């Protein structure tokens, strides 16, 4: 895969989520009734959320895979990418609620009925939500930590990647969509920087592997 393609793939998913979090019409809602009312007032934004979510589903996990084998092997890499992948693969479960909100509103159902549909989402979606939060946050923190320890990124960029997802969590708890956009954009920048910095797998020879192993303390 060409370097430009790897960079684009690594950044596409987090950037799609950054935009999604910025335009989400019910960002500060405290329940599904408020969320349904917000979607009813701005159905176009919710439609955009679903399209951005679709892009994220298609690109988040492949973006991880595109850079995984370019990074130093070891338990830290295995743990980091496993957690991040599990989290990203749970994303469709979160979008299930958005789909219900959009469909119900688009069909002209009352806000109360749409809220009841969202409240009745299948338990698997709730499990996905429960898994998504800790796994993707910890996974990205560990990827940033690996990049910092291995000196694969400038320290400032590595720390930006490390704190990006805890910052996302803080923005959700504080109801600050602009800060959330910054957080996910920081993840996108860190991942793209990694993709631009790391040597292509197919071109890595003995010397390249030795450099990475040495950087990782091997």
Show which residues each predicted segment covers.
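Hydrophobic, aromatic-enriched alpha-helical segments typical of multi-pass transmembrane helices
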Residues: 1-218
